[in-house]
Amino acid sequence: TEPNAGSDASKSQTEARLEGDHYVINGAKIFITNGPEAGVFVIFAMTDKSKGTKGLSAFIIESSFPGFSVGKVENKMGLHGVHTSEIVFTDMIVPKENLLGQEGKGFKICMQTLDVGRIGIAAQALGIAEGAMKEAVEYTKTRVQFGKPISKFQNTQFTFADMALRC
């Protein structure tokens, strides 16, 4: 994710230019899971902006590379055991052999990676929804209104039936 591109990989502003036996990369990525702790990253950068998505390339980088830095660490509402941060590349030197695949093939790699990630996020969301529904059902068994648990009211049962269909 980039500050001005969101999750639209085709709008990547990070640039990489080949200079002899290395690439020089400039740009930033945001919302990087374990950004302050990780030592190795796969990033995507434009090697030829004139080609649009066919100019996006993938690189394996290390936090020890000259020009790499960790930017702002996010103050999140949850998941405090996993830090999320910005990572910044200022004339970062990346060896030529750290190009992942071929120049211009990064968009395909990126899309394949995002597809797998999206499946995981969907599974996580479904698990959260199922857990929330379970908690709600238990609550309706103990919440008494008009002399009986609200789980006995037909409207509450219809609501849960609709929720179950959506999970």
Give residue ranges: language-model regions.
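Beta-hairpin (beta-strand-turn-beta-strand) motif
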Residues: T1-P3, M46
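Short glycine/proline-enriched turns and hinge-like loops at secondary-structure junctions
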Residues: D8-S10, N34-G39, G52-G55, H80-V82, ...
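Glycine-rich phosphate/pyrophosphate-binding beta-alpha loops
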Residues: P3-S7, I30-P36, L79, V116-G120
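Structural signature of FAD isoalloxazine-binding scaffolds in flavoprotein oxidoreductases
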Residues: D8-K11, E62, V88, V94
